[in-house]
Amino acid sequence: MQTLESTLNPPATASEFDTTIHRRKTRPVQVGSVTIGGGHPVVVQSMINEDTLDIDGSVAGIRRLHEIGCEIVRVTVPSLVHATALAKIREKLLATYQPVPLVADVHHNGMKIALEVAKHVDKVRINPGLYVFEKPKADRSEYSQAEFDEIGEKIAETLKPLVVSLRDQDKAMRIGVNHGSLAERMLFTYGDTPEGMVQSALEFIRICESLDFRNLVVSLKASRVPVMVAAYRLMVKRMDELGMDYPLHLGVTEAGDGEYGRIKSTAGIATLLADGIGDTIRVSLTEAPEKEIPVCYSILQALGLRKTMVEYVACPSCGRTLFNLEDVLQQVRAATQHLTGLDIAVMGCIVNGPGEMADADYGYVGKQAGYISLYRGREEIKRVPESEGVSELINLIKADGRWVEP
């Protein structure tokens, strides 16, 4: 006889305990020397805030980002003059630094701009809501199907030269939909909704596919996290139904600054990455672009998608703590933060110590007042005076051959 409890709570399956993130399978899209999708690591990118006409300033901004781990750099291109300036930027990068994958950001009525800049960059980002921009009419309340299709044909005609150019150069395009700039006909037809964002992207994808061009990356950004998450999930659903496998660029647009801007970006980006959705990310902050890169890598590290720093496991401290946990964690971090790939646990007492740090490579645990127990994995190696804890931890790492000089 089946009980009520077993009906409401069926036995858990092995898959429910799977802690691995299973990434959505996508096609690889090459952007310069970097590959987006196709099972490659999630790519980190950002955008310089210098005026593109400032050649030296733009080159310096690109270098600053690239040197701290930004793998693709986007540059705004609001006019033809800016498009030709990118040729000089690329030339100077090659002469004074090294090749950096560059993306041109093209918006309002960008047909001629995009065609010119496609010669000088690795990828062109276009906004479907603005690429063929028509000023909204105050008295319009709807679009007939004929009117909708007529504009679609105009978009296809306008987009074709760029698609052919990128296809023939074997370069890439990002179809970058923004919730705040959906085309009027999409708004009237689908509303101010994730569906409207998805349909806007699909329209441009179909145009590209009709011209045998599939080096595409897609984004559906919004400043509200629930809208952004819903749009990407719906896009994946539609692409799966249509047999499309384009990689996705994740981001919360206009996230703001400071702690909240970082939390807001993480809430959207990490939610999707945890579901296996997303191939490249950008954290958009109202701060210097260089501030975005550590946030990107921290998100990827926290999810186990890329390991680029030491993973520190530390308890929040309580009345059982036998040393100043906050100070000691800072000391341990200062001494070991260059040992990329290690997991180091700092635990204030024996209650949380060995159990919570079981997966760590090394542990620093308060088990007795004035003394520190050092662990290798689950094994306690030695007990030392608290004043010698950090130096003895370093000695243990050195003895195992895992120490490198900073």
Curated annotation (Swiss-Prot):
Pfam family, one: GcpE
Binding site for [4Fe-4S] cluster: C315, C318, C349, E356
UniProt GO MF annotations: 4 iron, 4 sulfur cluster binding; 4-hydroxy-3-methylbut-2-en-1-yl diphosphate synthase activity (ferredoxin); iron ion binding
Keyword 4Fe-4S: yes
Keywords: 4Fe-4S, Iron, Iron-sulfur, Isoprene biosynthesis, Metal-binding, Oxidoreductase
EC number annotated for this UniProt entry: 1.17.7.1
Pathway recorded for this protein: Isoprenoid biosynthesis; isopentenyl diphosphate biosynthesis via DXP pathway; isopentenyl diphosphate from 1-deoxy-D-xylulose 5-phosphate: step 5/6
Cofactor binding comment, as recorded: Binds 1 [4Fe-4S] cluster.
One GO biological process term: terpenoid biosynthetic process
Alphabetical list of InterPro entries matching this protein: Dihydropteroate_synth-like_sf, IspG_bac, IspG_bac-typ, NO2/SO3_Rdtase_4Fe4S_sf
This protein's record includes keyword Signal: no
Enzyme class: oxidoreductase
Job of this protein: Converts 2C-methyl-D-erythritol 2,4-cyclodiphosphate (ME-2,4cPP) into 1-hydroxy-2-methyl-2-(E)-butenyl 4-diphosphate.
NCBIfam families the UniProt entry points to: ispG_gcpE, PRK00366.1
Similarity annotation: Belongs to the IspG family.
Stated name of the protein: 4-hydroxy-3-methylbut-2-en-1-yl diphosphate synthase (ferredoxin)
Record organism: Microcystis aeruginosa (strain NIES-843 / IAM M-2473)
